[in-house]
Amino acid sequence: MKKKIICLFIILGSALNLPTFSHAATWYIRGSISGELSRSSDFFDRDSTATTPPALFGTTPGSDGRSIGAYGDFGRFLGLEGSVGAYVLPWLRMDLSHNYRPHMEYSGQANFAGVPGAQPVYATASSLSLMCNIFIEPMRLAGFSPGRLRPYLGGGLGLAYNRIDGMTYLFPGLKVHKISITPSGEKTNRAFMVTVGTLIALSQRVFLDVAYRYTDLGRVRTEAGRMYMNNLPAGIEISETRTRLGSHGIFLGLGYSF
């Protein structure tokens, strides 16, 4: 973490010797890469009282006294983003961004009652999102001339398409039932983000974009269907399970104004 902070200050400090932004630039394009950390994403039944098909977790307490579910998160992952936007006022810009998070590894623990020992859970997911964003530059709003640094605050709304492969539940403490694999699932839902960052001029047209961003990508779900079990190859029918997907991330982008 200290190394990342030092590198960020080096980037910001080096901007003192770089050109300022072009006053005439209105439109811009930007490509970014992000390093993100998932919030807790615990899977539960969509309806824990469902009977047709039955809920996977149900309503009884788990082995640790909590509601039965899969407790975990999607860990650390990378994202790619492409954006096109424009300044609608000297201090206000808007853009349309497309973000792809190609590989998110879910890892957690289940707590089914009566199962001894650990109950690891694994899955792989991905997400595509499209958002309309708005950014306010407070220094320009306050009447200061644009310099090499343009701090901003922003937010966006849009849609996210989230997909997850079948979730694998392992039961190493059981003698017969060792593994269950749920159906995969996909869902398109509303998404939003909030961000704070700064633009850094590399020339009158080229700029860096460094930002912190919180993103909520809505729900991830496994669909109702047949769950595989090693001791019952035909499996059993289960209802939908779901969680929310949110992340904290650092975004580094390179843009061009024209």
What are these regions (language model features)?
Residues 1-26:
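Cleavable N-terminal export/targeting peptides
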Residues 21-26, 91, 139-150, 202-205:
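Short loop/turn motifs that connect adjacent beta-strands in outer-membrane beta-barrel proteins
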Residues 23-39, 151-153, 247:
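Transmembrane beta-strand segments of Gram-negative outer membrane beta-barrel proteins
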Residues 26-28, 244-258:
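Outer-membrane beta-barrel "beta-signal"
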Residues 31-37, 96-100, 153-159, 198, ...:
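Transmembrane beta-barrel strands of outer-membrane/channel proteins
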Residues 35, 86, 98, 136-138, ...:
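Residue-level signature of outer-membrane beta-barrel architecture
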Residues 38-75, 99-130, 159-189, 217-230, ...:
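Extracellular/periplasm-exposed beta-strand and loop segments of Gram-negative cell-envelope proteins
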Residues 78-82, 128-132, 151, 190-196, ...:
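Hydrophobic, lipid-facing positions within transmembrane beta-strands of outer-membrane proteins
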